[in-house]
Amino acid sequence: MTTLSCKVTSVEAITDTVYRVRLLPDSPFLFRAGQYLMVVMDERDKRPFSMASTPSEKEFIELHIGASELNLYAMAVMDRILDQKVINIDIPHGKAWFRKSSANPLLLIAGGTGFSYTRSILLTALEEQPKRHISMYWGGRESQHLYDLAELRLLTERYPNLKVIPVVEQSDNGWCGRTGTVLKAVLEDFGSLANYDIYIAGRFEMAKIARERFCSERDASADSMYGDAFEFI
């Protein structure tokens, strides 16, 4: 692990609770797509955030931070970012990184800002294996929480092997996509997941249910399912 000092180069409020933050580390850095960093608050307090940027983007690190009065843990990090414009990070962490040696079709599943984890893997896969079949499911409470959906739709125009399925729990009048939970959508769309590499990010309970149901009902292999949650559940 390496500790780096990072200058905060930009902060964008992309929804009422999600911030896109770009960091400029003071030294070269290495990580694998799907890994995360720790923001060092003090010697005993380090807080994890997935990197939304890719390993090939050497000039910056991008984070998507969901922070609000209901999430004071992340809000304290945002307060420091906004106040000090400099943070220390510990990098890299996590074992749920993208397995590039596999040729299996990819299933990427994200809930909320778990998208940052799948974004890094998605962009890396398209860059290094541009013909690999990829299905990307992104779930949010409302359509506004699928904040980078326009970027994903542009990617589907460039890569016919990429399928993006957005899912919202509460649809509004202008919503034309799927409604419900992201796991329900996956189960409806796949009769078998036997040969898929599955990467999942979101609430721990979602990851737990996904592993149980995908393995028991859709023949998925637990050894081919990746997510930081699986280190803890």
UniProtKB/Swiss-Prot annotation:
Keyword Nucleotidyltransferase tagged: no
Assigned keywords, A-Z: FAD, Flavoprotein, Luminescence, Oxidoreductase
Record-linked SUPFAM superfamilies: Ferredoxin reductase-like, C-terminal NADP-linked domain, Riboflavin synthase domain-like
GO terms of molecular function: oxidoreductase activity
Top-level taxon of the source organism: Bacteria
Binding residue positions for pyridine: G111, G112, T113, G114, F115
BP GO annotations: bioluminescence
The UniProt record lists the keyword Oxidoreductase: yes
InterPro entries xref list: FAD-bd_FR_type, FNR_nucleotide-bd, OxRdtase_FAD/NAD-bd, Riboflavin_synthase-like_b-brl
Residue intervals of the FAD-binding FR-type domain: 2-99
Assigned EC number: 1.5.1.-
Family: Belongs to the Fre/LuxG FAD/NAD(P) flavoprotein oxidoreductase family.
Protein task: Involved in bioluminescence. It is a good supplier of reduced flavin mononucleotide (FMNH2) to the bioluminescence reaction. Preferably uses riboflavin as an electron acceptor when NADPH is used as an electron donor.
Name used for this protein in its record: NAD(P)H-flavin reductase
